[in-house]
From Swiss-Prot:
Disulfide bridge partners, by residue number: none
Species of origin: Arabidopsis thaliana
Keywords: Ubl conjugation pathway
Protein name (database record): BTB/POZ domain-containing protein At1g55760
Listed GO CC annotations: nucleus
Domain BTB, chain residue ranges per copy: 164-231
PANTHER family attached to this UniProt entry: OS08G0495500 PROTEIN (PTHR46672:SF4), OS08G0495500 PROTEIN-RELATED (PTHR46672)
Pathway(s) served: Protein modification; protein ubiquitination
Pfam family, one: BTB
Record-linked SMART domains: BTB
Lyase keyword on record: no
Domains: entry comment: The BTB/POZ domain mediates the interaction with some component of ubiquitin ligase complexes.
InterPro entries hit by this protein: AtSIBP1-like, BTB/POZ_dom, SKP1/BTB/POZ_sf
Length: 329
């Protein structure tokens, strides 16, 4: 028997298996065919007057961890003698993991040449985050690809200086950017360009409180192509820029990141920034680190210097935390 006897042809969402000679007692399993994220098999088992047709995904880590939830229409056509076409009712959202999860038993005698058509109507997977099903073919897939492409193109506009129309002057250098992008991401930038301010007239924005590498990281975040290493290095500068230019998502990203790696070397600086930029969770975490976990004793000299320079309200909060935590010790 030739290899083509086991081949399943596919086009778009249709899979078709042509079996040229189905004898009275036989079992056949197709070659794997790709549909969606998975490789699939069809199999037929004929016994006397019954024909069992199975559809199932190939065993793999993907199938085990995230099996497909399939909707499909299945049809068997026998072209020997009088043509017979049998259709299975549409299967909707059927979870198929093994070769026992979908079986169509046909009680009509079929011999000779048959064609099995499977038209996949939809394939879904379970979201690991929300626990909800989503289609791999829905508009969201195209939308996601479109978003990825758009962000990549936006990043190239910055890195390759494609049709830049405004210059950002940092403390030690300059970089070109685009008014429309800046205005879309920051109400402060948008206000600059709407009103007859010097930034609009000169096509320049001075951010002289930022070095060029931090400014580059700031713009990379705005354009959607920042690297994690650059983000971590420049978190505090990015936090300052987020506050200055009213970019709430950047401020929150910095806030969450600064919570991750508090230690004795950075806790005082982060406490000061948490107070300055009104980050209550970061402030509370720094307080607990210093007081409840006793790290205040490991940096006694640095803490004394900090207390001489800190804002009075912050000093008051620290004393309140100390009294509250150490009460009764």
């Amino acid at each position: 028997m030739t290899d083509s006897a086991y081949r399943v042809d596919t086009i778009s969402r249709l899979a078709q298996w042509r079996i040229h000679n189905l004898s009275s007692s036989t079992y056949r399993k197709s070659d794997p065919f790709k549909m969606g994220l998975w490789n699939w098999h069809l199999s037929v088992e004929k016994s006397k007057m019954l024909l069992n047709v199975k559809l199932y995904p190939e065993v793999s880590n993907l199938t085990r961890e995230n099996p497909p939830v399939a909707s499909f229409a299945l049809r068997v056509v026998s072209s020997t003698g009088e043509r017979k076409a049998l259709s299975h009712p549409e299967v909707i959202d059927k979870r198929i993991k093994t070769n026992e999860d979908f079986i169509w038993t046909i009680e009509v005698p079929l011999t000779g040449k048959i064609i099995i058509d499977v038209e996949f109507l939809d394939l879904k997977v379970l979201s690991q985050d929300s626990g909800e099903l989503y289609s791999i073919w829905a508009n969201g897939s195209t939308e996601n690809q479109s978003q990825v492409t758009a962000v990549t193109s936006l990043g190239r506009m910055l890195t390759e200086s494609i049709y830049t129309d405004i210059t950002i002057n940092a403390s030690d250098g300059s970089i070109g950017a685009h008014r429309a992008v800046l205005a879309a991401r920051s109400p402060v930038f948008r206000s600059m360009f709407l009103h007859d301010l010097k930034e609009k007239e000169l096509s320049e924005i001075n951010v002289l409180d930022m070095p060029l590498d931090a400014c580059q990281a700031f713009l990379s975040y705005i354009y959607g192509n920042i690297q994690n290493e650059d983000f971590l290095i420049h978190r505090l500068a990015l936090l300052q820029a987020a506050e200055k230019y009213d970019i709430a998502d950047l401020k929150e990203a910095c806030h969450l990141s600064l919570l991750d790696d508090i230690d004795t070397k950075n806790v005082l600086e982060r406490l000061q920034n948490a107070y300055l930029y009104q980050l209550p969770e970061l402030k509370a975490s720094c307080m607990r680190y210093l007081v409840k976990f006793g790290k205040i004793f490991e940096i006694r000299d640095e803490f004394n210097i900090f207390m001489q320079c800190a804002d009075r309200d912050l000093i008051s909060e620290i004393f309140h935390e100390v009294l509250s935590t150490w009460k009764g010790f």
